Regions:
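Glycine-rich anion-binding loops of enzyme active sites
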Residues: 1-88, 217
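Glycine-/charge-enriched secondary-structure boundary and capping motifs
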Residues: 13-32, 44-50, 100-116, 120-219
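Short, compositionally biased
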Residues: 87-98
């Protein structure tokens, strides 16, 4: 992993806190932080403003999506929030409706705290042994659940993807936007930040795990 951090000044604790967080995240996924770039641009960045980018290089197995067939199952691994996607819309909802960030959101958790949840790292949910049983994997990022999942399938592959009930955070989105479930799935992860496609015979070893759920099948 390599990082790029640019700011007005590296003085103070902000830069060190960010670097520490990157290091901790890399350790969680057994990834080496091998270098990066830091730039001070006081004429461009004011106060604590900064830009942060990261780049990860990895080896992957040869794709197995050509083995996907009718009857294979689609399993979703639950997300822990919005996962950094759809935040332009969320900010608009907050600003247009003058919603206070410190209001209660889900249970006793404040809205600001929920929105700042780090994206789940799915490395810990799957082992290298699992890869032999998985035909397709999708990290659900920008573009929502449907578009990201479709990218991992052979062209013209048909499937059924069913989310019976959206997590509570999407009631907030629907209340202020009147978006339908289909429209929400074009922007957000709908409660599942990662999907895998497996043969029906191999599905039980995944479905018995915490946060894994059957959400569809290949047609």
């Amino acid at each position: 992993f390599l990082d790029y951090y640019s700011c007005g000044s590296v003085k103070g604790t902000q830069y060190l806190q960010i670097l520490k967080s990157i290091t901790e995240a890399c350790k969680k996924i057994n990834c080496a932080l091998i270098g990066g770039e830091t730039a001070e641009m006081p004429s461009l960045y004011v106060g604590n403003h900064f830009d942060l980018a990261g780049f990860l290089v990895a080896l992957k197995e040869k794709t197995k999506k050509h083995t996907i067939k009718k009857g294979d199952l689609i399993i979703g691994i639950k997300s822990n929030g919005f996962h950094s996607n759809g935040y332009s819309l969320i900010r608009k909802i907050i600003n247009d409706n003058k919603i206070k960030p410190d209001r209660s959101f889900i249970g006793k958790e404040k809205l600001s705290s929920f929105l700042m949840r780090p994206t789940e790292l799915y490395h810990r949910h799957l082992s290298t042994k699992d890869i032999t049983q998985i035909k397709s994997m999708a990290h659900i990022t920008g573009g929502g659940l449907i578009a990201n999942f479709k990218r991992t399938l052979p062209s013209k592959t048909k499937f059924d993807l069913v989310i019976n009930k959206l997590p509570k955070e999407y009631e907030f989105i629907k209340k202020y936007t009147k978006m339908t479930n289909d429209e929400i799935s074009e922007v957000f992860n709908c409660g599942f930040g990662f999907t895998i496609v497996v043969d029906k015979k191999a599905s039980q070893q995944f479905l018995k795990r915490k946060n894994f759920k059957l959400i569809g099948s290949i047609k």
